[in-house]
Amino acid sequence: MSHANLWIDGNWVQGQGKSWNTCNPVSQQVVWQGNEATAQQVEQACEAARQAFPQWATTSLTDRIAIIERFALLLEQNKEALAKIISQETSKPLWETLTEVQSMVAKVAISIRAYHQRTGKSITEMADGAASLRHRPHGVMAVFGPYNFPGHLPNGHIVPALIAGNVVVFKPSELTPWTAEATVKLWQQAGLPNAVLNLLQGSRETGIALAQSEHIDGVLFTGSASTGYQLHRQLAGAPEKILALEMGGNNALIIEDIDDIDAVVHLAIQSAFISAGQRCTCARRLIIKNGQAGDAFIQRFIEVARDLVIGDWDAEPQPFMGGVISVKAAEALLKAQQNLIDLGARSLLEMKQLRENSALVSPAILDVTAVPDIPDEEYFGPLTCIYRYDDFDEALKLANSTRFGLSVGLVSPKRALFERMLIEARAGIVNWNKPLTGASSAAPFGGVGASGNHRASAFYAADYCAWPMASLESEQLSLPEKLSPGIVL
């Protein structure tokens, strides 16, 4: 039944908007029920955050970090419980959600290091004083979280924002409210002062109200390109607000050379189908060189993909992947598969719904080499398209033939080709003999084009959580030895 599912100004209150529930995508068992925040409750949260900002911003960095490190300790202590919540809400296997919570823990130390390296304080001595650089927090930051990593990805905005001295109003995906609620309760236990972090639950209307609030100073978003573009339009004409958009991709993995076929297949499986294809860096396109080696790779890739273990989050032994986020998402993927076939794609491995009224789907592999005008879309699930090519010029052209620019990868022992990709590829992440889905929180994460607005997250999140303040300083004022022309003193 519904409960107090909003955290506003240090109090748990029930949403006054429409009620809704979330279900496990595979079993359809209801796992959470609650009510949306109304526009009035959105304003209450934003006003409370505005009131809390001055005190939090002037709290010493040492004291802010102490609270944030207590949160990390609580995450570690509650790792399995939170991982089970994420698994029940998303259907991701427990092995994977345990790694997600561990990434949340690690984010704290990494973000502290990034704060000092990217946005700390520095002083340069000068003959007549000093030049200093400091960084100041923006104020009230609206954080919009996605459903695919409902713990880790919002955490990647919230932690650096709080370290820098900002306050946060957090709206998670309406598909994963339970994870957000459980995470915020850990922040509460950590001793975060009232209204420094506020939680709003709801769908599109709640998000629009939050983005339009006059009390916010910035929006930090991870999610689809369509929603990101909508937020960009909403904030048009508001240059005083910082906007960080981390969106999707139509990512390409170029397979040029195949020495160890199973090693390449494993890399491709991890790139295309991990998390049921619901990572923004997943390989939506496999660009494979023509020839017998490429033919053999495709055959082996199909065999391994067909045999992937897909099942419930708590099954033993553990599956490689669970379902996609909802039955609606599964149906959309099946429709996308059929649309591609209707355009002329050749199905090499057909995606099927594995259980009735369930989000469990098998992988799809389609050859679209001879198909003109393939839609430049992000199919957010275990669906990948194969393109064949003859020379590397053609492969690079194919890889760059997208409005997105998140990630691209190369499989080849030839470093010269990788060096060329580093110059010619249009993507924020360029990997070499590594899965596209591999990323490091100690590096920036983001893309160009429809994948983002040049506000990389991860280690560079510190950059959009504070603004630089430059100063020329001198403890004493004295008349210069030489005056400018035209001045008589």
Swiss-Prot record:
SUPFAM superfamilies noted in UniProt: ALDH-like (SSF53720)
Listed Pfam families: Aldedh (PF00171)
Superkingdom: Bacteria
InterPro entries for the chain: Ald_DH/histidinol_DH, Ald_DH_C, Ald_DH_CS_CYS, Ald_DH_CS_GLU, Ald_DH_N, Aldehyde_DH_dom, SuccinylGlu_semiald_DH_AstD
PROSITE patterns tied to this protein: ALDEHYDE_DEHYDR_CYS, ALDEHYDE_DEHYDR_GLU
EC number(s) from the headed UniProt entry: 1.2.1.71
Gene Ontology molecular functions: succinylglutamate-semialdehyde dehydrogenase activity
Signal peptide positions (record): none
Binding site for NAD(+): 223-228
UniProt keyword annotations, A-Z: Arginine metabolism, NAD, Oxidoreductase
Metabolic or biological pathway, per its Swiss-Prot or TrEMBL entry: Amino-acid degradation; L-arginine degradation via AST pathway; L-glutamate and succinate from L-arginine: step 4/5
One GO process term, biological-process aspect: arginine catabolic process to glutamate
Catalysis performed (reactions): N-succinyl-L-glutamate 5-semialdehyde + NAD(+) + H2O = N-succinyl-L-glutamate + NADH + 2 H(+)
Active-site residues from the entry: 246, 280
Its biological purpose: Catalyzes the NAD-dependent reduction of succinylglutamate semialdehyde into succinylglutamate.
NCBIfam families: arg_catab_astD (TIGR03240), PRK09457.1 (NF006992)
Family (UniProt): Belongs to the aldehyde dehydrogenase family. AstD subfamily.
Cross-referenced PANTHER family: ALDEHYDE DEHYDROGENASE-RELATED
Annotated protein name in UniProt: N-succinylglutamate 5-semialdehyde dehydrogenase
Species whose genome carries this gene: Acinetobacter baylyi (strain ATCC 33305 / BD413 / ADP1)
Upper taxonomic lineage: Bacteria, Pseudomonadati, Pseudomonadota, Gammaproteobacteria, Moraxellales
